[in-house]
Amino acid sequence: MKAWCSYTLGTALFLLGSLPTFAQRPPLIDETVPPASDHYPLPADAKPIAGVAAGTTFKFEMTDSKIFPATARTITVYVPAEYKGDKPACVYVGLDSLGFNAATVFDNLIAQHAMPITIAIGVSSGDVASATPPDNPRFDRSFEFDSRSDRLARFLLEEVLPEVERHTTADGRAIKLSTDPNDRAIGGGSTGAIAAFTVAWERPDAFRRVFSAIGTYVGMRGGEQYYVLVRKTDPKPLRIFMQDGVHDEWPGGPEMGDWWMSNQTMNRALGFAGYDVRHTWGTGTHNGNQAASLFPDAMRWLWKDWPAPVRAMEPGNPVLKAILRPGEDWQVAADGCASVTTLAANQKGQVFYPAQGAPEVSEIVAGGKPVLCSQPAAAAPFAFGADGRVYVARTEGGVTATDQAAHGPANVLGQGLNIGSLTVCNNGDIYAVTRENELWLIRANGEKVRLDKDLKGASGVALSPDGLWLFVAQGLSRTGLSYRVRSDGTVDAREAYYDFYVPTWADDSGAAGIGMDRDGRAYVATRMGVQVFDRNGRVAAILPLPGNAAGTGLCFGGHDFDTLYVASGGKVYRRKLHVTGAPPWAVPFKLPPWGAG
């Protein structure tokens, strides 16, 4: 037995000794980078100043959140001495509570009239106790702060701020907070910094001024996508101050990314996109020393010119410049539309949608909704043809084609097909996707040809303006499909060609309607608003909808087909663009030259 043990141990040691060992990485030395220094003395405005009245601070616990269930956290509220309680004050939200000597800085700057009277609210991240406290609690900080979603914004707006207003100061002053986004700022350090940016990014209708120190714009929970999203998205009315140091790296997770490089990349993206952004870089590591030293100047800059509103700037993205008209924004075209999933325009550019609960398709016009056709069309998909007829999907299957005045005979095509979306070509052929996730060609003579099956939530279909390619949207996927259109109308060469951006809280794009412009770009209504694709299947621009709502239907319309209509949340929005739409029923034409790049 001893011999066996001796042999086995010896063999094991021999084998272990023969295993490869990791080479030691030489230290990364860049002689152009100054040595690390975290010595940043506080300026006078970050220290108490004689004769300046100090504000009051109180705290309370929050343990009853519905958005972050079972969490416990501390809320800290600073109320300046100048606040009288007779009218709403401006708001600053500090994430990870009130850092950077915020109360003292605000005392001094408010006294100097360098910033408005502002109530500051420090919000710590939540913890969830285990079933056997204090053992192994769940720390929600990364989930709440690093996530690229609107959860934290909703938590602040729906739960924290209302709870703060239910309190009073020790001397009985009521807490009244302004609801004007121009009166609200938010800031934080590290994970609190990306959280502050995310809140303002998701809800620019609630926060417009952002302070970001040593921001965690890395691969924690999707933050590394911000550099690209900022470049591609229609600029929002935000002002951002950024701080970081050349030696910034969080020692607890360097595998997540490079803090210093990510902050520079984020700053460059914001500058490219057209934001009002300022930065100060230093020589520090991952701490708040430099941020605390410059916090007074950052607040002065963020609040400069107040109460003049923070406005969205001209985009730097060349695609956004090409398609957007300066000064044109989303306008409500129709309200009270219930759940609209189909929008379509006729040859005059008049835009119609299915009237919920009524047997007609209705036009979007000011002061009325005239009946378009008397066929059963309540909430049914429909499209217009080059022949002037409207093609409406029937609940019993197939498509009814009738003239818009409903005087001519109705033809039934594609009987037996449970159609979810359709488009009518110039030659009268119909491409349709069914609720069974199949793609069909319905020829003008009534012949049906199944082209594909096993789609993922097929939700839209569009033909390129030259008639050579077919785009099929899949609402339950992260990709859209491209097909080559053959001379007989059938298709081949299927590829998952279109890559959508998907919110971190969703599993799919929710793509639900496609329009094409005369340059060959595709516009798709999605969970993230309208995503604009170039001809190589890449998202080149994103147009968020009001309230960051999802789009559920889309088309070009207007007299010159230069207005984009998008259905969303019971409303239909319109936005006049600098490009012209290419209706599916139009005569195909040759597109401008394009390359493989």
Segment roles from a protein language model:
Residues Q356, T395, R435-E436, G475, ...:
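Short loop/turn segments immediately following the C-termini of beta-strands
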Residues W330-D335, G368-S374, H407-G414, E447-K453, ...:
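A short beta-strand motif characteristic of beta-propeller blades
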